[in-house]
């Protein structure tokens, strides 16, 4: 049995000597490299926090003391130390989650993987302990330097610092990166702190007796008249000046919090001492740990892009992917096309939130470095800054993962849309994303965005329509436009049979038409974006059972095109297939538009339930939620055979007549 296998919980660490702890750290690294290489996952971040996490669990007593991990992708070591070593199932259906999970362990508190929230959690937890008399309980928040670029973290620091008696320890895991190198003024400030030297000073400054001595000296001097007050001001100013030169804690202590560090995050003894000092102080303390992402694994350290932030299945010896060469992805299409657009249009600028490479903006940045801005993990700022850029005559393209749009929704609504700003938002990883779990699925955007006045939303089905719709989006100068697409390979081309004048594509007409004018079919299938693949398969399955159908791709799903409504009037049933939540989704909106225009055709909305969907593969999740061609075809066939709904009367004489455009007109 290895030493790691003998660890069933954090208490098992308490009796280990220094040599055993070093051995355990090595075993954990070997375990992570072996197991995460086999399943895929966040390898680099976890290799960088082995000693840090060991020290946290040695000094504090989880779950009595609450340990919160910001973002949570660096919690693998924490899982290993809290009795979860079945990593063969990591990020697989029914197996270990890739992020903290309350269902797995009482040691896990925060499940969301959205960055910069841990300090607000720590503020709330510690306030709760104080108000309920649990003064012996500590709250520890582990947050990366990348997450500290998010404004929410500083809102929490502002509140935590105002109460000097709450037992909050903030461990800054400073590896200089989020996905990629951390950017901005705060990142530069941390680099300045890294250059400082303070050995032994932290032990004094976090001693309550030091604070008490300073308080007594201040009281005696300020109470002794003008001369004493002048002496105090002089001594205090001298102390501050010397401190800022020798040990520049800077912004942290200016906010009223004790600062400990910088500490070598891979030195177990140093980390334990720093955390012990912080714990014993009894008030809010920042512990600044310097770590290396991918520490101890050469392939990760040599990866310039993101130091193995997240890996597929790889060969642990080389770090190279073991599967077939990656197919062209949606991100690749965006990467190439936005770079081409930027070459043609000097007014187009790119904005990203700490995701330059994952979003595909690096190619544009290499060609036009002054026109790509990485704002850090700051979606709110990104969108309002984009509105300002639009006001000054630029056309910003903001690249976000779909799940992170939620963080900047107010800014999209009130700063971009209200001001009719020509801003394009590109949403990668829309829909079901798979193994990263509920906080990474991009399934909320379709419902959220349809309530934004004047917004145009495109959902491309293949590479050609992606290129078209991105170019159409950046041609709009007086309204927000959004282009959404899923994670993964872009797939084969899906050519249209016909394009209506308002931009809606007819992808298929299967089966014999009927009705009084010979133009009606049984089922109209509307595919939203990448779900057009499923829509076409449903149509083929229905045709095999003698049920006729038409397949439409609206291309621009917001606003709803009139030709979609008129085509619906010539069918007995409409089926809308989308990879967002059904509640308030595109199907719901099409139904509203149909009823508003007097079209009473029955409509079935096929999408995701309003639930937090657990981690599994994309196909498994779609199977469980009923969003598969087989299930949709079965349900639709039953509806057709069981219905007595007559063909709806056509709303107009010609479903393909020129109508007002659903896609945005360049302006």
From Swiss-Prot:
InterPro entries membership: Dxylulose-5-P_synthase (IPR005477), THDP-binding (IPR029061), Transketo_C/PFOR_II (IPR009014), Transketolase-like_Pyr-bd (IPR005475), Transketolase_BS (IPR020826), Transketolase_C (IPR033248), Transketolase_CS (IPR049557)
UniProt keyword annotations, A-Z: Isoprene biosynthesis, Magnesium, Metal-binding, Thiamine biosynthesis, Thiamine pyrophosphate, Transferase
Gene3D superfamilies hit by this protein: 3.40.50.920, 3.40.50.970
Pathway in which this enzyme or protein is active: Metabolic intermediate biosynthesis; 1-deoxy-D-xylulose 5-phosphate biosynthesis; 1-deoxy-D-xylulose 5-phosphate from D-glyceraldehyde 3-phosphate and pyruvate: step 1/1
EC number per UniProt: 2.2.1.7
Family as reported in the entry's similarity comment: Belongs to the transketolase family. DXPS subfamily.
Descriptive protein name: 1-deoxy-D-xylulose-5-phosphate synthase
Species per Swiss-Prot/TrEMBL record: Kocuria rhizophila (strain ATCC 9341 / DSM 348 / NBRC 103217 / DC2201)
Name of the coding gene: dxs
């Amino acid at each position: 049995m290895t030493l790691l296998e003998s660890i069933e919980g954090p208490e098992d660490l308490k009796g280990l000597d220094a040599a055993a702890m070093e051995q355990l750290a090595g075993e954990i690294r070997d375990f992570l490299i072996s197991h995460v290489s086999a399943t895929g996952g966040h390898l680099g971040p976890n290799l960088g926090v082995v000693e840090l996490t060991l020290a946290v669990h040695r000094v504090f007593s989880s779950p009595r003391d609450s340990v919160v991990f910001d973002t949570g992708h660096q919690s693998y070591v924490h899982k290993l130390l809290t009795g979860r070593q079945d990593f063969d199932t990591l990020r697989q259906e029914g197996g270990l989650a890739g992020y903290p999970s309350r269902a797995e362990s009482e040691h896990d508190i925060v499940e969301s993987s959205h960055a910069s929230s841990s300090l607000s959690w720590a503020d709330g937890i510690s306030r709760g302990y104080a108000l309920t008399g649990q003064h012996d309980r500590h709250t520890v928040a582990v947050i990366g330097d990348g997450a500290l670029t998010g404004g929410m973290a500083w809102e929490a620091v502002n509140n935590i610092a105002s109460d000097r008696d709450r037992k909050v320890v903030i461990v800054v895991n400073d590896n200089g990166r989020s996905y990629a190198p951390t950017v901005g003024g705060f990142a530069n400030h941390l680099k300045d702190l890294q250059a400082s030297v303070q050995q032994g000073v932290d032990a004094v400054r976090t001693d309550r007796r030091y604070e008490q001595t300073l308080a007594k000296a201040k009281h005696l001097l300020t109470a002794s008249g003008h001369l004493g007050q002048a002496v105090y001001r002089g001594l205090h100013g001298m102390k501050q000046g010397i401190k800022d030169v020798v040990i520049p804690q800077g912004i942290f202590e200016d906010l009223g919090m004790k600062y400990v560090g910088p500490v070598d995050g891979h030195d177990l003894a140093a980390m334990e001492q720093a955390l012990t000092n912080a714990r014993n102080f009894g008030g809010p303390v920042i512990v600044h740990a310097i770590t290396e992402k991918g520490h101890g694994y050469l392939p990760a350290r040599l990866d310039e892009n993101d130091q193995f932030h997240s890996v597929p299945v790889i060969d642990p010896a080389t770090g190279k992917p073991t599967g077939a060469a990656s197919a062209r992805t949606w991100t690749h299409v965006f990467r190439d096309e936005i770079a081409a657009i930027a070459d043609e249009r000097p007014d187009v600028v790119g904005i990203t939130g700490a995701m330059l490479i994952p979003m595909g903006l690096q190619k544009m940045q290499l060609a036009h470095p002054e026109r790509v801005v990485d704002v850090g993990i700051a979606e709110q700022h990104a969108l309002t800054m984009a509105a300002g850029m639009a006001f000054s005559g630029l056309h910003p393209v903001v690249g976000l993962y779909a799940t992170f749009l939620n963080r900047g929704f107010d800014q999209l609504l009130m700063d971009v849309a209200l001001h009719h700003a020509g801003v394009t938002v590109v949403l990668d990883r829309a829909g079901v994303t798979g193994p990263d779990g509920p906080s990474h699925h991009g399934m909320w955007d379709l419902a959220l965005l349809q309530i934004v006045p004047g917004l145009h939303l495109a959902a491309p089905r293949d590479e050609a329509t992606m290129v078209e719709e991105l170019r159409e989006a950046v041609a709009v100068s007086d309204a927000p436009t959004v282009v959404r697409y899923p994670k993964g390979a872009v797939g084969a081309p899906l050519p249209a049979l016909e394009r209506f004048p308002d931009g809606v594509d007819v992808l298929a007409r299967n089966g014999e038409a009927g009705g009084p004018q010979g133009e009606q079919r049984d089922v109209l299938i509307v595919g939203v974006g990448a779900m057009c693949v499923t829509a076409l398969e449903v149509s083929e399955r229905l045709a095999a059972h003698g049920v006729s159908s038409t397949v439409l791709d609206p291309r621009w799903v917001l606003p709803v095109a009139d030709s979609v409504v008129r085509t619906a009037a010539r069918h007995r049933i409409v089926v809308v297939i989308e990879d967002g939540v059904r509640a308030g989704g595109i199907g719901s909106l099409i139904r509203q538009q149909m009823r508003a225009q007097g079209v009473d055709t029955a409509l079935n909305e096929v999408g995701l339930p309003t639930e937090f969907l657990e981690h599994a593969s994309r196909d498994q999740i779609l199977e469980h939620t009923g969003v598969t061609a087989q299930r949709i075809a079965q349900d639709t066939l039953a509806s057709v055979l069981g219905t007595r709904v007559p063909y709806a009367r056509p709303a107009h004489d010609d479903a393909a007549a020129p109508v007002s455009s659903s896609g945005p007109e360049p302006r």
